[in-house]
């Protein structure tokens, strides 16, 4: 049985409603989902199922039309209060860096906004996070326009971690990255999750990322969580979306075991 203290996010009977009156429509109806301490949960679903929308009430950015959302043991709406949001890190799909700020100032932004710390301490903390995500000290003075897509992701990740949050939310973390950069970013996320004891919730459409990172997968369909379990378990669930998503060519390729290296033949004797 899961202890209440081990439930990082508790979504209970959530209705996500947009519009008003006759124009109102529900993206989610009676959606239930719990996120447990230490797991890496991926949320997947077809077009229009509102995967990213699920993250918004968890951050207190969207008031549920109905239902209840608790994050880190308190009503999620309270995260909008001063200081409370520092306990949840958010990595947006395209990084969302401030173009007029240097890399260092982007990373340090939330810490500076909180106030109360000498600038030297803020800069040191930002430099630690910069190197934690695999960037070099000389990158600190660069502007976002001078960075590659992979570097932007790393800076955004460092910014999300600057307040040492126990909970990290990721929106399409490997979108726009080439396969090598995607693999490297996944390896970085795995290492940070292990080193920092993070709980991670991720929205992704990338099957390679899903299989590389997820300890559990929740599938959204029919305005609710249709099924959750390991990637291998949900891949076998009988539903049109899971069949198309997991059993198509991309899914089969992502689930295929990595080929073992062929040993080199011993050199022939002279």
Region locations from a protein language model:
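ABC ATPase NBD coupling module
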Residues: 75-89, 113, 120, 234-237
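Conserved ABC ATPase signature
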Residues: 143-147, 151
